């Protein structure tokens, strides 16, 4: 069995899909379906069982067994960069992750987990997986950074695989439940389909991010499980492309629309990553050599998926 925490969420459900594509269906999905809309991410996927996150954590802390577990993909976390409840964030992201990590170490179960590019904070260059480059801007980034630091202490003595992925700006299918935290491509598509003008912040040609397609993210996760490599790795494309490029690709698919530029909100000033670009040196050195989709390629594929029933 493979366990996917956050398996009804964005990246988790895409990992489930990637496993299904390889014929793997003996999957336990762990999630919190208090947000009932997330179930739609699983309706076209095949899993063996579902468990609520709280019940799962109780069983993990009690040392209960789940049968023959081949790996745990730990994607379950609070991923809102605008959540400032530090106790909630540390319980949900840091303590929960530590419990799972030790459960896996004791049983030598491969543990593959979601870190984040938010660990780098407001950098504009040198997004390198090393302590001197890490200075998170928000409590979400701090919770991810602290767990990475914890893992670094354990890695040298670990007898089983531990791998963390610093996801950059992931977009693609199955993110609709994320609301305001969904990608720009998702929001632009929604606005266009409502007959509204698609909106970007003023200066969007200067805001550049490493936008990585979720299908590529799932592929990297599965490659690492198959190859047993440990460590903490950036997971982006290695390219910085502008929000304007995302909008251009969206409009190219729809063949209509005119961008409306809106003022940059005061509440995000100083807390907003204006530039991200993954340094892929370590990922490539680990042996992962597949290409990543460009914004033009990924957004076109995503638009086709979003509008598949149109």
Curated annotation (Swiss-Prot):
Keywords: Acetylation, Carbohydrate metabolism, Isomerase, NADP. HAMAP family: Heptose_epimerase. Contains a large N-terminal NADP-binding domain, and a smaller C-terminal substrate-binding domain. It is an enzyme of class 5 (isomerase). The lineage of its organism: Bacteria, Pseudomonadati, Pseudomonadota, Gammaproteobacteria, Enterobacterales. This is ADP-L-glycero-D-manno-heptose-6-epimerase. NCBIfam families: heptose_epim, PRK11150.1. Substrate binds at residues 169, 180, 187, 201-204, 209, 272. Homopentamer. It comes from Escherichia coli O9:H4 (strain HS). One of its GO terms (biological process) is carbohydrate metabolic process.
């Amino acid at each position: 069995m493979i366990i996917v925490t956050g398996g009804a969420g964005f990246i988790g459900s895409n990992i489930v899909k990637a496993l299904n594509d390889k014929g793997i269906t003996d999957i336990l999905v762990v999630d919190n379906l208090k947000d009932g809309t997330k179930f739609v991410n699983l309706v076209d996927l095949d899993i063996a069982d579902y468990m609520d996150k709280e019940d799962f954590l109780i069983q993990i802390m009690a040392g209960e067994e789940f049968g023959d577990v081949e790996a745990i993909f730990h994607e379950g976390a609070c991923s809102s960069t605008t959540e400032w409840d530090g106790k909630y964030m540390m319980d949900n992201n840091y303590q929960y992750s530590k419990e799972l990590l030790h459960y896996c170490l004791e049983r030598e179960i491969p543990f593959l987990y979601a870190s984040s590019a938010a660990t780098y904070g407001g950098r504009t260059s040198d997004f390198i997986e090393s302590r001197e480059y890490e200075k998170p801007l928000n409590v979400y980034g701090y919770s991810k950074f602290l767990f990475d630091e914890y893992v670094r202490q354990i890695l040298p003595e670990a007898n089983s695989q531990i791998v963390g992925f610093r996801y950059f700006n992931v977009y693609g299918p199955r993110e609709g439940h994320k609301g305001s935290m969904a990608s720009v491509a998702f929001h632009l598509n929604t606005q266009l389909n409502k007959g509204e003008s698609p909106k970007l912040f003023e200066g969007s040609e200067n805001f550049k991010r490493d936008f990585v397609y979720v299908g590529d993210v799932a592929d990297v996760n599965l490659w690492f499980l198959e190859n047993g490599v440990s460590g903490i790795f950036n997971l982006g494309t290695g390219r910085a492309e502008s929000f304007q490029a995302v909008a251009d690709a969206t409009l190219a698919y729809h063949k209509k629309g005119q961008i409306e530029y809106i003022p940059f909100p005061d509440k995000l000033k100083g807390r907003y990553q204006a530039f991200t670009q993954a340094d892929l040196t370590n990922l490539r050195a680990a042996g992962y050599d597949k290409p990543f989709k460009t914004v033009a390629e990924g957004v076109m594929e995503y638009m086709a998926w979003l509008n598949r029933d149109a």
